[in-house]
Amino acid sequence: MSQPLSLTAEQPVHFIGVGGIGMSAIAGILAERSYNVTGSDPKQSAQSQLLRQQGARVFQQQNAATIDAICSGVDRAPLVVVSSAIPETNPELEAARGAGLRVVHRSELLAWLINAQHSIAVAGSHGKTTTSSLIASLLHSAGLDPTAIIGGVVPAFGSNARNGAGEWLVAEADESDGSLVRFHPQLGLITNLELDHTDHYPNLDALVATMRRFSGNCSSVLANRDCPVLSAELSADHWWSLQENSSAHFRAVPLSLDGAGCRADYLEDGRRLGELALPMAGIHNLSNALAAVAACRLAGASFADLQAALTELVPPGRRFDLRGEWQGRLIVDDYAHHPSEVDATLTMAQLMVSSGKSTLPWVPKRVVAVFQPHRYSRTAQFMERFAEALGCADEVLVAPLYSAGESAIEGVSSATLAEKVQQAGHSARALADMDSLVDAVQQCSSAGDLVLVMGAGDVNQLWSRLQSSADQQGLATAA
């Protein structure tokens, strides 16, 4: 049994892979709280730069020399933090263990933060980042000054982390490796449950078992009544629903859903409190927003404050994120990497086309999907569902599969996925490498189109590639 984690401000803390979206958020909170924070990451990122501005020391190399450097001139041995993305063969991790330093998983440090104050931990297969971002933004607007540790950049804060002075901490509880069972929040929120992360969960029952352990650790649970798995398999103290006839404690009955946003009647325990107006399209976003409002109400925020703040909300980074205009096309980036997420994102985009209303600068003529499969295991598990979801686009470009360190599986590739889309009667092509994506986008899209870039790998770099190509050709882009 590992020793319980307890930190004081004198304890140096070192993050291996500090530029990651989850690691950098925790590091940022500690830096803001005047801890001696160091980190390493070979990739430079906006998160790494922000940490430097907060006083953290960030190394670009990951090797034994970094461990020597952080151990030099300190009175206490540094605590070393890693995520599941760091392999045991990482040379810096090997050096840390060789030096006898204590090494903990990021979830242990996050649990220490969550368990130390009133907290809201947002779990679930989809919508965690959006929902936790909305909760933090709404609590901030309501004057409750929350601390936030989010898996995406929150527009209201310009960061994935915020160190507030209020009693509430909002954190995203990632289920991908099962480590969320370490958390004991005051309020556990579960957005939905669906099989994913098949590298860790062999079946849905295994995922449900983990979520039961998590919910059992929560003082109170708020869950989505509209999710059939949650309704059947888990118990909750509070439920939310978009269904008019539901018995859920918190309801938002849709009045209008179009490409420019959502409107719904809001009810608590059957009593109508007013109308919610959300400037984000998609039924999934209305569910996320209702969950956020419900959580904030349980945290003590007034409905009037939440109602007003909701109209100004913006989704977090990489969630239908408008990067800019390129040769008359709108380029939008999204983190969707599961079939349900791809389907929801493309459905939202096509709603803008069909309704003639859009949150974007103009109503798109067509939707061109650029999708990068993420992990061989996930692509193999959901090949048919990915093909079905991508069929919602007018054109499909499949970028090279991002392995995330997994070994190849025979018969699983971007080309195989493109063939599946074609077999269903839709236009699709696979790209051999990332360099060919720019030409493919130019060939398969036209001025007025929406180019929707989806994936959890490096496909988000397409925008910078498009900008570079425009600079080389003397063409205009608008960010």
UniProtKB/Swiss-Prot annotation:
Which GO terms are recorded in the biological process aspect for this UniProt protein? cell division; cell wall organization; peptidoglycan biosynthetic process; regulation of cell shape
Gene3D superfamilies reported in the protein's UniProt record: Mur ligase, C-terminal domain (3.90.190.20), Mur-like, catalytic domain (3.40.1190.10), NAD(P)-binding Rossmann-like Domain (3.40.50.720)
> Which SUPFAM superfamilies does the UniProt record give?
MurCD N-terminal domain, MurD-like peptide ligases, catalytic domain, MurD-like peptide ligases, peptide-binding domain
Which residues participate in ATP binding?
124-130
One Gene Ontology cellular component term attached to this UniProt record is: cytoplasm
Pathway, per record: Cell wall biogenesis; peptidoglycan biosynthesis
* Family annotation (Pfam families): Mur_ligase, Mur_ligase_C, Mur_ligase_M
Going by the UniProt record, its keywords in alphabetical order are: ATP-binding, Cell cycle, Cell division, Cell shape, Cell wall biogenesis/degradation, Cytoplasm, Ligase, Nucleotide-binding, Peptidoglycan synthesis
Q: Supply the enzyme class, top level.
A: ligase
The UniProt catalytic activity note for this protein reads:
UDP-N-acetyl-alpha-D-muramate + L-alanine + ATP = UDP-N-acetyl-alpha-D-muramoyl-L-alanine + ADP + phosphate + H(+)
Its Gene Ontology molecular function terms?
A: ATP binding; UDP-N-acetylmuramate-L-alanine ligase activity
Give the subcellular location: Cytoplasm
Q: Is the Cell cycle keyword given for this protein?
A: yes
Which domain of life, per UniProt? Answer: Bacteria
Q: What is its main location?
A: cytoplasm
Q: What is its EC number?
A: 6.3.2.8
Against InterPro entries, the record matches this protein to: Mur-like_cat_sf, Mur_ligase_C, Mur_ligase_C_dom_sf, Mur_ligase_cen, Mur_ligase_N, MurCDEF_pg_biosynth, UDP-N-AcMur_Ala_ligase_MurC
HAMAP family per UniProt: MurC
What's this protein's family per the entry? Belongs to the MurCDEF family.
Q: What does this protein do?
A: Cell wall formation.
**Protein name according to UniProt:** UDP-N-acetylmuramate--L-alanine ligase
Origin species: Synechococcus sp. (strain RCC307)
Protein encoded by which gene: murC
